[in-house]
């Protein structure tokens, strides 16, 4: 049975792919769950159009991620003042991904989502310089140094 996938299916393909599957798998699993449609000329044209729009969106997303990467690299490092720091250098609280995003925005960087920020550990709990990686796109990531300093 020849089908066009309308959803990503593990070990089979992604949206818009034309696949050949056994009749029972298509009739009893893929079609009832709306994961595929029967291949026809009209459906194939629609799938090709969806694939083209997805490819242009992927190119646009990659270009946008590269622009953000250049803006972040231009910053070099970001200072993050923390109000509550002990004399030993440990923080009473912790620095989260949201704090890093706010510091980047305050330093003149782009507005980012805190979910793309990957801290070395779950939270930063000490004063000093810490490398932070940001996953902007599945193929693009950038590293930024965050200087956590005690505010006096």
From Swiss-Prot:
HAMAP family according to UniProt: Ribosomal_bL9 (MF_00503)
UniProt family annotation: Belongs to the bacterial ribosomal protein bL9 family.
Entries under InterPro entries matching the protein: Ribosomal_bL9 (IPR000244), Ribosomal_bL9/RNase_H1_N (IPR009027), Ribosomal_bL9_bac/chp (IPR020594), Ribosomal_bL9_C (IPR020069), Ribosomal_bL9_C_sf (IPR036791), Ribosomal_bL9_N (IPR020070), Ribosomal_bL9_N_sf (IPR036935)
Keyword Secreted: no
Top-level taxon: Bacteria
Keywords assigned by UniProt, alphabetized: Ribonucleoprotein, Ribosomal protein, RNA-binding, rRNA-binding
Originating gene: rplI
GO CC annotation terms, alphabetical: ribonucleoprotein complex; ribosome
This protein's name: Large ribosomal subunit protein bL9
A Pfam family: Ribosomal_L9_N
The organism's taxonomic lineage, starting at the top: Bacteria, Bacillati, Actinomycetota, Actinomycetes, Mycobacteriales
An example molecular function term from Gene Ontology annotations: rRNA binding
Protein purpose: Binds to the 23S rRNA.
GO biological process: translation
NCBIfam families: L9
């Amino acid at each position: 049975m020849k089908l066009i996938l309308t959803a990503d299916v593990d070990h089979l393909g992604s949206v818009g792919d034309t696949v050949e599957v056994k009749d029972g798998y298509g009739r009893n699993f893929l079609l009832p769950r709306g994961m595929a449609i029967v291949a026809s000329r009209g459906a194939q044209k629609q799938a090709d159009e969806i694939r083209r729009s997805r490819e242009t969106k992927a190119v646009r997303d990659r270009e946008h991620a590269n622009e953000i990467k250049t803006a972040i690299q231009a910053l070099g490092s970001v200072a993050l003042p923390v109000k509550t720091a002990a004399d030993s250098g440990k923080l009473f609280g912790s620095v989260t991904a949201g704090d890093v995003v706010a510091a980047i925005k305050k330093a003149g960087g782009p507005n980012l989502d805190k979910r793309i920020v990957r801290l070395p550990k779950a939270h930063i709990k000490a004063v000093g310089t810490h490398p932070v990686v940001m996953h902007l796109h599945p193929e693009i990531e950038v590293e930024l140094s965050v200087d956590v300093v005690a505010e006096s």
